[in-house]
């Protein structure tokens, strides 16, 4: 199980069933008891999770694709005209990754009472998004980073 968590966290998806297993994990409440139960899965348990997660994963990607299609627009972030979408933080990784294809990077944002949060994603061919995030006081990794701006910032008003 831990290998699948790492596989998704590092956005490698090299282990068979990672997306499906993680879909099952994400469908449960985040409690220590539930995590203990999920982490104790043996090989048969992982196979069952893979089967159960296939439909969840299919629905997730269908929803992400449809939302990106209707929500995507362009915005200048860090001097780069890139695709963006206003989506819940739970969809940021998959949605921004999809929009980043053929682009320097892509962003998803979600508003809170305090300001606007941005999640940036880039493909291997894209820019180092941690450098972009640092311009706004954020940080992260080369291909996944983020930052937050206050409600009166120009990026929060467009």
Feature names for model-found ranges:
Residues 20-27, 55-62, 126:
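A short, terminal or domain-edge coil/loop segment
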Residues 1-48:
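Internal, active-site/partner-interface "lid" segment
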